[in-house]
């Protein structure tokens, strides 16, 4: 199942994403975040990726938002604040 999810995201990155201009407000991009989340957390990573996509809109601050080590649907705010100070 994990491999199928990874292949699906990579297919999106290769064939669908290039059809529109870059618009992700975060680093890494939402699709790269989803890949990392699936690799780290298995199928739970899908939920993390979906939560990330739902946070990607103009009413939320942009910036660095890496996949947390522990499963969480919330933004990794500590890392984001530390990155802004650096």
UniProtKB/Swiss-Prot annotation:
It is found in: Cell membrane. Keywords: Cell membrane, Membrane. SMART domains: Haemolytic (SM01234). It is a peripheral membrane protein. InterPro entries: Membr_insert_effic_factor_YidD. Signal peptide: none annotated. Belongs to the UPF0161 family. This is Putative membrane protein insertion efficiency factor.
